[in-house]
From Swiss-Prot:
Chain intervals for the UniProt region annotation (Disordered): 214-248
Keywords: Ribonucleoprotein, Ribosomal protein, RNA-binding, rRNA-binding
GO biological process: translation
All copies of domain KH type-2, residue ranges: 39-107
Protein family per UniProt: Belongs to the universal ribosomal protein uS3 family.
Encoding gene per record: rpsC
Protein known as: Small ribosomal subunit protein uS3
Organism: Azorhizobium caulinodans (strain ATCC 43989 / DSM 5975 / JCM 20966 / LMG 6465 / NBRC 14845 / NCIMB 13405 / ORS 571)
Assembly description: Part of the 30S ribosomal subunit. Forms a tight complex with proteins S10 and S14.
Protein's UniProt keywords contain RNA-binding: yes
One GO CC annotation: cytosolic small ribosomal subunit
Length: 248
């Protein structure tokens, strides 16, 4: 039977890049990799209420830079920055190096695959009907600009005796198109009947330039707020002069 490859891993180096961005020699690589795993586990556990989408770790010389993508940056920072100082100290104890923590706000959590999957999983744990939770997530994503979305829920849905898989899809989700910006996220709901798995694919459009940092740049631009949509003055003047020359 054909299986679906992870859309994020398939597009690494094309329009996506790695969440751990550093180089190490053979002796240190394994140690640093396990450090990254422990840092992510600790942050996701500590910031369960902060709607964290992903954690990017960079390691300049004898330093560690952690970037947290969150829909609720206020929860991460805490009152007068107290919570973020505690996190910085914990990460510094784990890495034994100087730590910098940056926070990037996710303006549209409804079209972030991981956050959508976590939201559906939390609703399943609260005994919300799975069809209602899935339909609501699909409608919200399409309303906020997604070009397509697919949601899979599997397990003993609604307390059924036999586990099954239910899915909804709206729009198009091209998994084979490498230039497509397809976000993918998973979550697990721990119910009284057992665990239910949630998978979400969200298609946000095509990225035509070959830039591994394209997705990160788009997320950062969205967090900084909406732009006016007008090109810089130099470009406008150049376009106006070109139109005038062609008319002449």
């Amino acid at each position: 039977m054909g299986q679906k490859v992870n859309p994020v891993g398939l597009r690494l180096g094309i329009n996506r890049t790695w969440d751990s961005r550093w180089f190490a020699n053979k002796g240190d690589y394994g140690t640093l990799l396990h450090e990254d795993i422990k840092i992510r586990q600790m942050l996701l556990k500590q910031l369960k209420q902060a709607a964290v989408s992903k954690v990017v770790i960079e390691r300049p010389h004898k330093k560690c830079r952690v970037t947290i993508y969150s829909a609720r940056p206020g929860v991460v920072i805490g009152k007068k920055g107290a919570d973020i100082d505690k996190l910085r100290k914990k990460v510094a104890d784990m890495t034994k190096s100087e730590v910098f923590i940056n926070i990037v706000e996710i303006r549209k959590p409804e079209i972030d695959a991981r956050l959508v999957a976590e939201s559906i999983a939390q609703q399943l744990e609260r005994r919300v009907a799975f069809r209602r939770a899935m339909k609501r997530a699909v409608q919200s994503a399409m309303r906020l600009g997604a070009e397509g979305i697919r949601i899979n829920c599997s397990g003993r849905l609604g307390g059924a005796e036999i586990a099954r898989l239910e899915w909804y899809r709206e729009g198009r989700v091209p998994l084979h198109t490498l230039r497509a910006d397809v976000d993918y996220g998973t979550a697990t709901a721990f119910t009284t009947y057992g665990t239910c798995g949630v998978k979400v694919w969200i298609f946000k459009g095509e990225i035509l330039e070959h830039d591994p940092m394209a997705v990160d740049k788009r997320m950062t631009a969205e967090s900084e707020g909406p732009s006016s949509g007008r090109p810089p003055r130099r470009d406008r003047d150049r376009d106006r002069d070109r139109d005038r020359d062609s008319a002449a």
